């Protein structure tokens, strides 16, 4: 039996080919195509992340932030 190590709220919108690692909390956000989200990341409601972004481990993206396409957050 596999236990999920991710918390993804039902109102999260995920694009195509998004990669989400373990220990991630996503709440009411929009994640663009081909974006990678590392371990121990929290993304709050109202956040919009563009296509082909990299959100590195231990990042915290607060409510209402917009991140354009092809951005790396470390």
Give the role of each language-model region.
Residues 4, 9-10, 15-16, 21-22, ...:
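Left-handed beta-helix
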């Amino acid at each position: 039996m596999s236990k999920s190590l991710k918390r993804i709220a039902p109102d999260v919108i995920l694009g195509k080919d998004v990669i989400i690692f373990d220990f991630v909390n996503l709440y009411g956000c929009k994640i663009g195509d081909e974006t990678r989200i590392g371990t121990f990341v929290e993304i709050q409601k109202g956040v919009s992340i563009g296509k082909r972004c990299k959100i590195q481990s231990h990042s915290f993206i607060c409510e209402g932030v917009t991140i354009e396409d092809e951005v790396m957050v470390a």
